[in-house]
Each structure stands twice: as C-alpha cells, then as structure tokens.
Amino acid sequence: MNWLHAIILGIVEGITEFLPVSSTGHLRIVEKLLGYDIQGAGITAFTAIIQVGAIIAAILYFWSDIVRIVVAWCKGLAHKEDRDDPDYTLGWGIILGSIPVGVVGLVFKDAIETTLSSLWVVAIALILWSGVMWLGDRQLGLNRGMKEIGIVDAIVIGCFQALAPLFPGISRSGATISAGLFRKFDRATATRLSFFMGIPALVAAGIYESVSAASDISIAQGGAVAIGWGPTILATVVSLIVAYVSIAWLLKFVSSNKFTGFMWYRVVVGLIIIGLILSNVVTA
C-alpha cells in the first residue's frame, strides 16, 4: 500500500466511524475502488487496526465522562447510598448494553467476515435503515436527558447495536442513535449515548481483531498489493485526528439539527454502490 492510499483510507475511517453512515460500507467501497480485495487477510487486518485510531479519539474526547462514570459505578458498588447517582445506572447500562453485540460478534464471526461483508448487503442496509432513522427522528417528545437513562433503555440500545455487525450498512452509530430516539431521548443525548455504548464494544473488537490479524499486515496481500506497517500506522494516526474533529462536529451539529441530511446521504451512497456493482466497476 502506498502512503497516499493510507492517508485516504485513514480520512475515510476518521470521518465515518462515528457518523450514522456506515464506516464499514465506506471503507469497503473505497478499498475496492483503490484495487484491494476486501476479503483479503491483509486489508481485513489493516481495516481492523486503523479503526483503533478512531476508538482512541473517542476515548480522548470523552475521557472526563468515562472517568466520572467509572468512579460513580465503583462508588455505587461499594456504598448503597451512592446508587442513586445517574452515572452509576449509566455504568451498568453500558456494561449490559455491550453484551448483545459481543455475543453476536462471536457467534456469527465467520458469516460477518464472509457472506455478510458483501457490498450488496452494505448497499441495501444503508438504504433500508435510512427509513428506520427517519421514523426515529420524527418521534414526538424527544426530551429525555442523560440523567434519565434506565437499564431497559441501555438494553434496547444494546440490542440495536448488535444489528450493526450483522448488516454492515446499518452503521453502529446509526443503529444506536435510532434506538435512543425511539426511547425518546433528545438528539444530543441519543448521540452521546451512542458513543458511550459503543466504546466498550469498539475497544474489545479493536483489540481482538488487531491482535488476531496483526501478522497479516506484514505477510499477507491486500488484493495484489502488500499492506505494510508504515502505511498502517500512518492511516491509524490520520484516523485518530480526523475522528476527533468528526466527533466534535457531530455533537455540535445534532444539538440544533435533525438527522435528515444523513438519511438522504445514506440513500445516495447505497444507490451509488448498487450502480457500481451493476456496471461491474466493483464486484460485490
């Protein structure tokens, strides 16, 4: 892989990882257009590792929130009188809400990495989930805040999150934000919950995939092109920087805007992918 391709893919990952537009779908189509085999061991390892950059960006951005939630959860475990703290409940919610996606990832690992990685699946999921987001965005009474989250809310959001690895085009953030909206949280809170619910799952998946696939970076081929550690590290750093900016922008955007633009964007991208497949520019 050359340095320019590494920068391009790092930017794509950084921009799309936390937006409700499917980072997996974008990476796969861009990797295809750049000439890589998206089911090749090398490019699969590359994709898993550069996602760690975006995950680190989220941890850095929400570090004070993470520390506050962890401290509240630990205090609640030690002292019953501290269990009324909303952050204690949120801590349990994040733990319980992370279980469904972990189970799905382990049980359906082979299908996720093969059959379900088809660009047809990505394109159709991008388009169809836009309708789900549209319904969620038009819920009445979207006024619940972060302090109102309960265990049931977290489990519902977690179950929605578990759909993302099964159907890559759905987008993990698209699924969790939609769930938050259906639970009547305001858009800003639904988005922040999406980050909090996603961080444990993304960290676990990132570590697992990176460790298990790291050797493929140096010995495997991404299509006809070797990947290499230099471009991989560069892409990871680029994804970290771009993802940090993307997170800040998204939180500011949702504080005063609906998700309509993202919905239409998803439909357009889905149709473009279908067009590229039908015209044999890329293979599914």
UniProtKB/Swiss-Prot annotation:
E.C. designation(s): 3.6.1.27
Pfam families found in the cross-reference section: BacA
Reactions listed under catalytic activity: di-trans,octa-cis-undecaprenyl diphosphate + H2O = di-trans,octa-cis-undecaprenyl phosphate + phosphate + H(+)
Subcellular location: Cell membrane
Domain of life of the source: Bacteria
Leading EC class: hydrolase
Keywords, in A-Z order: Antibiotic resistance, Cell membrane, Cell shape, Cell wall biogenesis/degradation, Hydrolase, Membrane, Peptidoglycan synthesis, Transmembrane, Transmembrane helix
General remark: Bacitracin is thought to be involved in the inhibition of peptidoglycan synthesis by sequestering undecaprenyl diphosphate, thereby reducing the pool of lipid carrier available.
Role of this protein: Catalyzes the dephosphorylation of undecaprenyl diphosphate (UPP). Confers resistance to bacitracin.
Protein name: Undecaprenyl-diphosphatase
Gene that specifies this protein: uppP
